[in-house]
């Protein structure tokens, strides 16, 4: 029995978001298990997997040999191994790359479409979940595994939760919150991730950027002390030789259309406009504003003015909830 995604409604900014239950159908789950799973992942992703605690989750990058990200992954321990969450548009292609050397290790890597991904966000999200689970994650324990359910805590843009669980539990949560929460689809979670500065890598932007171009280092997702992994040389060079000239930015404003992932924007230069950047994600809110996540040069002036190509409206830089200072 499958879990049906909720019908879409216009996303709401975090500051005004009522209690909302979100079906995360644009995200997908994979599991990595087996005796060698930790060691195998250690050679494939940017973070120090051996240091990943039982109550932690981390946004890490999986790179090609040139240091470009196939994908980023929300990685955590689950049951007897690891689980990761990434965008559905590239999960299967990314897993093909991740499995390339698995034949030499005791490791099983599989896409998991049996379990359900749900988000709980908005006004009094914690209170809404309190009676449904014995323990909820928080700043001290951002991950709680409770039977078949993994609960992940996010601080930004406001406290919210991501649930990885079976269909029966997803149905139970849905029924418990029916009438109390509004329901929405992945676009609402996408809007919150843009506000939080959490990079969105969809298929169109796979193998285009080194991790630092999307701020993964600022989110604690790169270890510069661990042993080698695929793409490490290029990732290290970007740090120690200052080779990375790009960063992830959060823009907001108006636009007559929502830009698509992979397209560029335009930067105002005096009386003219110059193409710049690559859009990772964008969404239009219920109040008409457009939020855009974009990779651009890391030396942009804070008062720079942008627009969707040939548009009459403008976008401006918004603050991120973390520092990019090394």
From Swiss-Prot:
Residues passing through the membrane, by range: none
A cellular-component GO term for this protein: cytoplasm
Top-level taxon: Bacteria
Compartments, record wording: Cytoplasm
Sequence positions that bind folate: 27, 189
Gene Ontology molecular functions: folic acid binding
Keywords noted in UniProt: Cytoplasm, Folate-binding, tRNA processing
GO biological process, any: iron-sulfur cluster assembly
Role noted for this protein: Folate-binding protein involved in regulating the level of ATP-DnaA and in the modification of some tRNAs. It is probably a key factor in regulatory networks that act via tRNA modification, such as initiation of chromosomal replication.
Family matches, as NCBIfam families: PRK09559.1, ygfZ_signature
Similarity comment: family membership: Belongs to the tRNA-modifying YgfZ family.
Protein name: tRNA-modifying protein YgfZ
Organism: Enterobacter sp. (strain 638)
Taxonomic lineage: Bacteria, Pseudomonadati, Pseudomonadota, Gammaproteobacteria, Enterobacterales
